[in-house]
């Protein structure tokens, strides 16, 4: 980690500006040779000519950040040049020719971590912030990058250290009875701490589900209007629509966004009794999709009375016990479907929508609202967020240890053991891992210039 490294810090491609970043003991010397300028005041921007082997490459902006007051904690130099990919690579190559090494993925951030400029929670936040596509999460990630998760964990750790110290004092005077007020006070303190951890964990789990996307299966018997519904929601002809039964023989998946939530639409084969082997396989996949989805859109044909196939679908819906939106299609035709019978057989949470123009704006707006009603309401204001499986596992283990400690309040040695184990798990959220392999895995998610 003592090498001087260099990399392009901006995305590849043409643009107004590209940034070449250098970090290490030799960074300033390399900048001086590139610019043929000897004096750089830290944190001042200089317009400089950039040279390579005495050949002028560009007129650019150069900034020097003196250690330890830089992102990495080392001497850092930035060259903000014109955004030509060829020019940028030539400037980077000039840095390498002068003794810098090409940075590995995430190596700048790794230097920042090892030089105590950032902790693990801030590193995790910066990774997720770069990859984030959900506007509602940006605030939580920005607060984590600012260090608020670290502060939250440090406060919890300090509270637990106080409990541990009190317990150790009582162990030294083990011949005396444990004061009842101590037991009550510690029990309440642990309950409060466990509740705050669970709140963080629950919010993070819900946000993870939101990022993954809600799976929405569209089912119904053949020609009920499933594919028309999918096409209307996508605003394109994604699925083939035909009067011939069994046209859709496999599931079709597409992703849309509804009110800030990612939704995976799954159009399925029409459910009916069939002798066609391929169609039967499609129907089996349709029924399987009900097990794996979060919400169901079940399309019924209002112009036809309920048939055996409809009741088979209703039975399948009831077995899933999942929320359902019942779409009653073709209400412009003479209604023959026994609506009250349908309602009486449904044993799951559902809402209902009638339409015959599945591509109408009013219908789609109504349908979107009904779908969104099933989404969990996430209040992201003033919320912290766990951004990795490692963080989640560490906090879950800490909660388990605190619950164990609460169950052993009257056995101080066991109580202290579980409190100490909880503290060790909290350390994993913000403090260094013991293995370089885990560090390398985490930092490899970054680009070269980060």
Swiss-Prot record:
The keyword Acetylation does not apply. Its EC number is 3.6.-.-. Its main location: cytoplasm. InterPro entries: G_TrmE (IPR031168), GTP-bd (IPR006073), GTP-bd_TrmE_N (IPR018948), GTPase_MnmE (IPR004520), MnmE_dom2 (IPR027368), MnmE_helical (IPR025867), P-loop_NTPase (IPR027417), Small_GTP-bd (IPR005225). Keywords: Cytoplasm, GTP-binding, Hydrolase, Magnesium, Metal-binding, Nucleotide-binding, Potassium, tRNA processing. Transmembrane segments: none annotated. GO terms for cellular component: cytosol. Signal peptide: none annotated. Gene3D superfamilies: P-loop containing nucleotide triphosphate hydrolases (3.40.50.300), Probable tRNA modification gtpase trme, domain 1 (3.30.1360.120), tRNA modification GTPase MnmE domain 2 (1.20.120.430). Binds 1 potassium ion per subunit. Mg(2+) binds at residues 227, 248. K(+) binds at residues 223, 242, 244, 247. GTP binds at residues 223-228, 242-248, 267-270. GO terms for molecular function: GTP binding; GTPase activity; metal ion binding. Pfam families: MMR_HSR1, MnmE_helical, TrmE_N. One of its GO terms (biological process) is tRNA wobble uridine modification. The keyword GTP-binding applies. Residues 213-376 form the TrmE-type G domain. PROSITE patterns: G_TRME (PS51709). (6S)-5-formyl-5,6,7,8-tetrahydrofolate binds at residues 21, 78, 117, 450. Homodimer. Heterotetramer of two MnmE and two MnmG subunits. This is tRNA modification GTPase MnmE. It comes from Helicobacter acinonychis (strain Sheeba). The gene is mnmE.
């Amino acid at each position: 980690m003592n090498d001087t490294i260099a990399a392009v810090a901006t995305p590849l491609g043409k643009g107004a500006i590209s940034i070449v970043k250098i970090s290490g003991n030799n960074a300033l010397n390399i900048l001086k040779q590139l610019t043929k300028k000897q004096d750089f005041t830290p944190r001042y921007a200089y317009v400089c000519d950039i040279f390579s082997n005495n050949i002028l490459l560009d007129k650019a902006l150069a900034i020097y950040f003196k250690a330890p007051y830089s992102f990495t904690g080392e001497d850092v130099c930035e060259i903000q040049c014109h955004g030509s990919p060829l020019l940028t690579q030539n400037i980077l190559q000039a840095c390498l020719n002068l003794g810098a090494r090409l940075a590995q993925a995430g190596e700048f951030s790794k230097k920042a971590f090892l030089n105590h400029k950032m902790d693990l929670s801030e590193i995790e936040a910066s990774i997720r912030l770069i990859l984030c596509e959900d506007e509602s999460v940006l605030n939580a990630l920005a607060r984590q990058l600012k260090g608020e998760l670290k502060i939250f964990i440090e406060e919890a750790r300090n509270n637990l250290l106080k409990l541990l110290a009190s317990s150790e004092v009582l162990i030294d005077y083990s011949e005396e009875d444990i004061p009842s007020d101590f037991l009550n006070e510690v029990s309440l303190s642990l309950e409060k701490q466990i509740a705050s951890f669970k709140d963080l964990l629950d919010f993070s789990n819900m946000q993870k589900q939101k990022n993954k996307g809600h799976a929405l299966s569209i089912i119904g018997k053949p020609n009920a209007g499933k594919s028309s519904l999918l096409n209307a929601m996508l605003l394109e002809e994604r699925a083939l629509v035909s009067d011939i039964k069994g046209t859709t023989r496999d599931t079709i998946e597409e992703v849309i966004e509804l009110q800030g939530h990612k939704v995976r639409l799954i159009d399925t084969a029409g459910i009916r009794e069939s002798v066609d082997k391929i169609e039967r396989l499609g129907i089996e996949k349709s029924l399987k999709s009900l097990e794996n989805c979060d919400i169901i859109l079940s399309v019924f044909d209002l112009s036809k009375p309920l048939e055996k196939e409809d009741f088979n679908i209703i039975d399948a819906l009831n077995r899933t016990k999942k929320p359902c939106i019942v779409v009653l299609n073709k209400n412009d035709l003479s209604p023959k479907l026994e609506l009250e019978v349908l309602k009486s057989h449904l044993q799951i949470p559902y809402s209902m929508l009638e339409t015959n123009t599945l591509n109408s704006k009013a219908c789609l707006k109504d349908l979107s609202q009904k779908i969104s009603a099933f989404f969990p309401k996430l209040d992201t204001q003033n919320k912290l967020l766990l951004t990795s499986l490692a963080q989640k596992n560490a906090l879950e283990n800490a909660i388990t240890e605190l619950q164990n400690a609460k169950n052993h309040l009257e056995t101080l040695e066991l109580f202290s053991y579980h409190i100490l184990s909880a503290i060790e798990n909290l350390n994993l959220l913000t403090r260094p891992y013991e293995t370089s392999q885990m560090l390398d895995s985490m930092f490899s998610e970054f680009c070269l210039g980060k």
